[in-house]
Amino acid sequence: MPAAAWAVAEVGAAGLGDARRAARLATLVSDLAARPDVGIPAACATPAATKAADRWLANDAVTPEAILAAHITATAERSGGEAVLLAVQGTTALDFSAQPALAGAGPLAHPAHSGLVVQSVLAVSADGVPLGLLHQHSWARDPATTGARHTRRQRPTAAKESQRWLDGQAAIADVVPAAVPVLTGADREADVCDLFAQSRPSHHELLIRAAHNRRIGEETRQPWTAARAAPGGAVVPVAVGRGGARPPREALLVLRWTAAARGRRAIAPHGPPCRPCR
C-alpha cells in the first residue's frame, strides 16, 4: 500500500472537527513516515507545506487524544485476526533538560533532569510484528511529590504511578476485539499485586518480570523458590558480551514455569484475591 493511502487508512478518520484537518494529519503522517529520521521542516516537501503543518499543529482543535484514538482504532482492527496478541507495556522518560524554557515539564529520575513520562502499550503479533499502540498516556511529575517514596506503603495504588500498569491493562480489555487472547508483558516495575488482582477477561493473561519474592497464597513457599524447583521446560542459548577481564561467552538460559496463587500484600489484606498466575 502506498504511504499516502496507508496514512489515510490509519488516521484519516481522526475526530478533529473538520475533514481538512484530518486530511492534513494524513499528509503529515505520510511525509514523516517517508523520512522518520528528520523533523517536520525537512520531511515536508516545500516551505508552504511546512507552514501549513505549523498552522495545523497550532490549531486548538488538533489534540493528541484525537490523533491517538484514530491510530488505536486501526491497531484494534489489525489485532482482530491474531490467534494470540502480545501487549507490551513499558514506560519511557522524555528528557527535555536541554530546553529549560519549555513549560509543562516535570522532574525525572535524576533531580537535574526534567521532561515527561510516557506509558505505552504496544500490540505485537506472535511472530513479532508490531501492530501499533493500544494505549498511551503521558504526564509531567509534580515537583512537590519528589522525595515521597518513603510514603509509598501508606498510599493506595491509585495515588501512585503504579496505577499506570492497571490503566494500561484496562485499556487493553476495552479496545482489543473480545475473542482475541491477549498476553500482556511488562518489566519489574509492573510487579504490583493490584495488577494481578484487577478484573480482566479470562483469556487475558499477564507475564510480569518478578521484583518481589512474595509468599505464595497460604503456603510457605516463595515464587523464586518454587520456580527453581520446577523442571526445566526449555533451554535457550544466550550470547553474553565481554565484561572487564571476562571474555565473551555463550550461556544457557533454562526456562522453568509453574502455576501458583499469589497472596495480597499485608497492607491491603481485604481486597480481591489474586488470580492464579503462571
Segments (PLM) and residue ranges:
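Single, function-defining residue in the core of a domain
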Residues: 1-102, 110-117, 122-278
